Structures are given as C-alpha cells and as structure tokens.
Amino acid sequence: MGFSDVYACNPFPSAAFVTQRFFCTNKSCYAKQVSWLHGHENAGLHHKIFIQHAKLLAIAQLTYRINLKTKQLQIKFCSMAALVFSLEDLESVVPEVLGVD
C-alpha cells in the first residue's frame, strides 16, 4: 500500500549503535528510550533500519517498512502496535541509512 519492497521481519543484527530516540505508543504517550541500529545495502531501495528497546530485548524479530514517497519508517514489534517515524529525522543523524552520497 504505497510502501517500497523494503519489507521484512528479521532478527536483530549485530550492527553499530547509531543514536537514541523517543517514541510514544498508540495507547499511552510516554517516552521510551530506544537505540537505533542499522545495516545498509547500497542497492536501490534495499535499505535496512533496525530498532532495539531495552525492555524488549527478548523479542528477536521486528517488522519494518519504508515509504520513500512520504519519507516515513514504520516499525512493528511482534507484540506491539506499529510506530511511525519520519525519515527526515533519521537522515539528519545517519545519512547513510538512506543511501545519501
């Protein structure tokens, strides 16, 4: 539905620590500290972005989709509602995630 073919449910990789973000769940809007992990493939639309949460380390998989038209990243933990982030925020922190030269 408008999303690119970047869609997968992958185990957490051993990737470099990038930065920390806060997000609000759909049910209650309270800050949770998260750590952005990412892997990058310089191949068209195939970009991988991973997220890790301190209280959810036991969850080995997540689902993510990247909408390149609206520049949004949607992440869904296996037991949580989807979270939507703006790729513009990520681009200012980790340009290589979007394959920016």
Curated annotation (Swiss-Prot):
InterPro entries from the UniProt entry: DUF5479
Physiological role: Not required for CRPV to induce papillomas, but may facilitate the functioning of other viral or cellular factors involved in the induction of papillomas.
Swiss-Prot/TrEMBL keywords: Early protein
Protein family per UniProt: Belongs to the papillomaviridae E5 protein family.
Pfam families: DUF5479
Protein name, as recorded: Probable protein E5
The encoding gene: E5
Source species: Cottontail rabbit papillomavirus (strain Washington B) (CRPV)
